[in-house]
Each structure stands twice: as structure tokens, then as C-alpha cells.
């Protein structure tokens, strides 16, 4: 969603017609692959209670940003183990060619501090370098949170020249600055 907003916004800024902006937004969405891992739930204000329960010793892999169930729930793992499993899932989905270009987002789901995100990014960077994927414009921070959830999501956005150009186009806002 973040990548689609950026590329569609850049296309609109270039005065592309609505059909082109829509095409670019869809192309970007199709190029994005995400997976999340959570250590805690979040509380949606309208509900007033956590969206799901999870013990302090457990985690959930593959859950959705709104608390949708993941692919497995089990014992908490190390940051490196979590990052490696998430990268494995994304690479299996994408199967990139050597020389592919991707933007990578390591996103806090709300309560995960920046320092921990950089620990996870270290694994992402190494793993993509190992398969000869060039990382373009890495993003590490809070881009799409789930209230106070402790967790992380990884998004890999496959880039061609059109999407890369739009992603790197100037943007000036509190959320995203490219100069």
C-alpha cells in the first residue's frame, strides 16, 4: 500500500492521466510481497480489547496487520531466525533472478523500536545480496502500524525502470521525503 501510494502519487505529480495512475498503482501492488510476524496483539479502539491473545513466550508468523491469523503460532525465536524465515517466505514467493532490483521495507507494526528493525534489516540485506538482488531505496521504520502491536512486516517491491523512477521521484511530506 505504501509503495502504491508513492508511485501513483509520483505519476499524478507528472500529470499522467487517471488511467495511467490507476495502472501504475495496480502494477506496484502486484509487484509487492509482504509477510509479518507478531509478538503481541493490538487493541482496536472500537473493540476495546486485543484482537487476539498470545503468550509472552510465543509469536505468530504471517499474521495480517489487522490481526488476521498467520501461517503458524509457536515459541518465540531469535531475531535472526525470524528474519531468515520471513525472507525465505518472500523469496519462495518471488523467486527473483540474479540482478533483480527491489525496494525493501522493514516496517514496525507499532511497538517495535528502530534499533530492532535495523537488526532485522541486516539479515534482509545479506540474504538479498547472497542471491544477487540489488536493494534500491531501503525503508526501515514505521510506515504502516497496527496500533501498539510488537512485530514487524517485510515488504519486497520488485522494480522495473518505470516503478524505480517513480519511487525515486521527489516527494516532500512528513511521511516520505525524497529530494
Can you annotate each of these PLM segments?
Residues 1-66:
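Internal, active-site/partner-interface "lid" segment
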Residues 13-23, 54-65, 72-83, 132-146, ...:
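Hydrophobic transmembrane alpha-helix bundles
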Amino acid at each position: 500500500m505504501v509503495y502504491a501510494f508513492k508511485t501513483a502519487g509520483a505519476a499524478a505529480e507528472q500529470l499522467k492521466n487517471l488511467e495511467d495512475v490507476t495502472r501504475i498503482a495496480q502494477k506496484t501492488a502486484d509487484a509487492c510481497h509482504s509477510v509479518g510476524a507478531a509478538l503481541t496483539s493490538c487493541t482496536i479502539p472500537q473493540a476495546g480489547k486485543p484482537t487476539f491473545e498470545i503468550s509472552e513466550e510465543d509469536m505468530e508468523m504471517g499474521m495480517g496487520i489487522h490481526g488476521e491469523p498467520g501461517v503458524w503460532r509457536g515459541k518465540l525465536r531469535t531475531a535472526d531466525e525470524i528474519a531468515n524465515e520471513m525472507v525465505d517466505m518472500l523469496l519462495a514467493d518471488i523467486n527473483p533472478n540474479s540482478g533483480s532490483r527491489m525496494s525493501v521495507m522493514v516496517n514496525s507494526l507499532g511497538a517495535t523500536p528502530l534499533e530492532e528493525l535495523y537488526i532485522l534489516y541486516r539479515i534482509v540485506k545479506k540474504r538479498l545480496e547472497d542471491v544477487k538482488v540489488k536493494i534500491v531505496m531501503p525503508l526501515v521504520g514505521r510506515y504502516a502500524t497496527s496500533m501498539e502491536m510488537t512485530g514487524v512486516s517485510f515488504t519486497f517491491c520488485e522494480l522495473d525502470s518505470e516503478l524505480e523512477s517513480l519511487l525515486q521521484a521527489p516527494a516532500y511530506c512528513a511521511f516520505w521525503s525524497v529530494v
